[in-house]
Curated annotation (Swiss-Prot):
Function: Tachykinins are active peptides which excite neurons, evoke behavioral responses, are potent vasodilators and secretagogues, and contract (directly or indirectly) many smooth muscles. Is a critical central regulator of gonadal function.
Name this protein carries in UniProt: Tachykinin-3
Keywords: Amidation, Cleavage on pair of basic residues, Neuropeptide, Secreted, Signal
Provenance organism: Mus musculus
Gene Ontology cellular-component annotations: extracellular region
Length: 116
């Protein structure tokens, strides 16, 4: 669930940046603004790759998020199976059938006397 929320936040920020939503500082700090803008220059190859990437539709985003929210419930069974296999590998194979009680012969068992 956290990963889906993080993905949605990153996607929203990247879409806002792609469509030109930019926060601008007041012009009172003009000298500092030019110094900071040099720090955030991206290489042209990265910019070209970002602009050439295909846009994400809202329907596609909703499909991905709905699959992400449904996914962990469906994958819980295989994960449980994997953990079971892991512990069986550590502890050794166990019998799949429950222990069947054997007939106890009274002659071989020690007795402590008759209780009244």
């Amino acid at each position: 669930m956290r990963s889906a929320m993080l993905f949605a936040a990153v996607l929203a920020l990247s879409l806002a940046w792609t469509f030109g939503a930019v926060c601008e500082e007041p012009q009172g700090q003009g000298g500092r603004l030019s110094k900071d803008s040099d720090l955030y220059q991206l290489p042209p190859s990265l910019l070209r790759r970002l602009y050439d990437s295909r846009p994400v539709s809202l329907e596609g985003l909703l499909k991905v998020l709905s699959k992400a929210s449904v996914g962990p419930k469906e994958t819980s069974l295989p994960q449980k199976r994997d953990m079971h296999d892991f512990f069986v590998g550590l502890m050794g194979k166990r019998n799949s059938q429950p222990d069947t009680p054997t007939d106890v012969v009274e002659e071989n068992t020690p007795s402590f006397g008759i209780l009244k």
